[in-house]
């Protein structure tokens, strides 16, 4: 169920979008991985570069086609001029991702305009696509320019074959970065010394920035300023609006691990991610910006860290003062770590996933050796950041005890009373029946996530 990435339904949607572009005269072309389209696609998505003058029309067409094909939920992630358009149809286990690219601009620097790129496009089946020569040019530039370079083997082959097959590549590179740097880069490509080529990426970036600025100085200044203002606004000032955070809470043995595995698998499928994309950042209990207190004690020679994690209540509660220091330490980690790491997750369009959360300080203080009044623990938790969604896995105490005997039956029952009370305090909490198979709970949780983080079409 979770394996299909592109089939005939995807092809019909893509075909209808491009046909509509052609009907009303919107110029576009597909970038890379077009072989086999419309019904076969070696990639998980499709990148379409669209004439910048038709941004609104192109987006409206895509949304109308999604609706016409039964897409129920829509999610969009924007990275500069790249609009990643996700469509989801949960009832039919279907997901599609089409990236509409309205300018190929990296951190404000534009090397090629749309018109310049369009000159290197050609027809393929019923689509307009970027030709093989400029596909190689774009792979060479944009897998290095302005970012830490990483080259898959397939990209190395594309770059090498472009160099060998198209004499214009060498001349273009000289025009972009100058003769001396071009010769060093070309020599590395010729001998397949790609590690050496990547060592020149910083020089390449500087040369390309200089080229872009000389080509259109005022526009480049404007685009660079807009890039950093937009990024700063999103990540620093408005990260809460864009964050996709949720946590899972329950007594040990309730099936959190299995539930999360199933849920993250579904998120990856319906948001068209590969595991290597790392679109789900999983935290355990807290952000862990600050180290474990046990590790600090071991490092300063106070005592050896206790790593027997099979018994969560293995240690005696700390004294009153020590407990206050502990909960203050956790509060600081949540405040600093959440604000830092979730901002980073927003920057890279990741889900922030917490396996357990600060609510454990209320329901299970023995785990963290706290001996403080309930009202104190509640106050500290209230003053911490909170995820947008909290899933509470509610199961019969006997079922929980049968799965894992780390806690006594009466302790499981006690914790569940507290968790249930917590789940009634705010609409961020969603109680799920954990007596049933994890797949069913994950399906229900997925619908909550879609309702929270996507739009209905």
Q: What are the residue ranges of the model-derived segments?
A:
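A glycine- and Lys/Arg-enriched "phosphate-lid" helix/loop adjacent to the NTP-binding pocket
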Residues: 356-421, 430, 434-435
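NTP-dependent small-molecule kinase module
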Residues: 202-218, 398-457
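P-loop (Walker A) phosphate-binding loop of NTP-binding proteins
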Residues: 251
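ATP-dependent small-molecule kinase phosphotransfer cores
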Residues: 287-368, 374
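Short beta-strand-centered segment that lines the nucleotide-binding/catalytic pocket of NTP-utilizing
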Residues: 270-293
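Conserved NTP-donor binding/palm subdomain of two-metal-ion nucleotidyltransferases/polymerases, i.e.
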Residues: 2-46, 50-244
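Hydrophobic positions on the alpha1 helix immediately C-terminal to the Walker A/P-loop
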Residues: 259
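Conserved lysine of the Walker
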Residues: 256
């Amino acid at each position: 169920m979770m394996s299909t990435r592109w089939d005939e339904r995807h092809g019909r949607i893509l075909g209808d979008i491009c046909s509509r572009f052609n009907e009303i005269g919107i110029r576009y072309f597909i970038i890379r991985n077009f072989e086999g389209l419309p019904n076969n696609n070696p990639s998980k998505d499709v990148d379409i570069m669209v004439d910048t003058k038709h941004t609104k029309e192109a987006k409206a067409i895509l949304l109308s086609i999604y609706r016409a094909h039964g897409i129920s939920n829509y999610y969009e992630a924007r990275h500069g001029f790249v609009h990643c358009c996700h469509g989801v149809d949960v009832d039919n286990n279907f997901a599609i991702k089409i990236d509409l690219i309205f300018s190929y601009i990296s951190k404000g620097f534009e090397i090629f305009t749309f018109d310049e790129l369009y000159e290197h496009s050609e027809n393929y089946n019923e689509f307009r696509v970027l030709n093989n020569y400029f596909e190689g040019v774009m792979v060479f530039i944009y897998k290095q320019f302005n970012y830490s370079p990483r080259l898959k083997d397939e990209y190395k082959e594309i770059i090498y074959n472009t160099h060998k097959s198209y004499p214009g590549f060498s001349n273009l590179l000289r025009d972009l970065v100058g003769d001396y740097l071009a010769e060093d880069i070309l020599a590395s490509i010729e001998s397949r010394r790609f590690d050496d080529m990547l060592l020149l990426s910083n020089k390449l970036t500087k040369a390309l920035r200089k080229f872009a600025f000389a080509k259109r100085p005022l526009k480049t200044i404007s685009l660079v300023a807009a890039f950093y203002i937009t990024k700063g606004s999103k990540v620093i000032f408005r990260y809460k609006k864009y964050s996709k955070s949720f946590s899972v809470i329950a007594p040990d043995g309730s099936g959190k691990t299995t539930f999360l595995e199933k849920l993250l698998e579904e998120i990856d499928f319906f948001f068209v991610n590969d595991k290597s994309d790392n679109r789900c950042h999983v935290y355990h209990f807290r952000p862990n910006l600050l180290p474990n207190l046990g590790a600090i004690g071991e490092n300063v020679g106070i005592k050896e860290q206790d790593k027997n994690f099979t018994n969560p209540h293995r240690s005696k509660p700390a004294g009153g003062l020590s407990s206050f220091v502990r909960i203050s330490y956790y509060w600081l980690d949540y405040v600093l770590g959440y604000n830092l790491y979730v901002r980073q997750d927003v920057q890279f369009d990741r889900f922030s996933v917490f396996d357990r959360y600060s609510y454990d300080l209320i329901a299970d203080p023995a785990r963290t050796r706290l001996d403080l009044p309930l009202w104190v623990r509640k106050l500290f938790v209230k003053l911490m950041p909170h995820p947008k969604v909290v899933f509470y896995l509610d199961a019969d105490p006997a079922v929980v005890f049968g799965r894992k005997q780390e806690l006594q039956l009466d302790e499981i029952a006690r914790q569940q009373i507290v968790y249930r009370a917590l789940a009634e305090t705010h609409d961020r909490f969603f109680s799920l029946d954990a007596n049933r198979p994890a797949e069913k709970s994950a399906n229900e949780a997925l619908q909550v996530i879609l309702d929270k983080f996507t739009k209905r079409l």
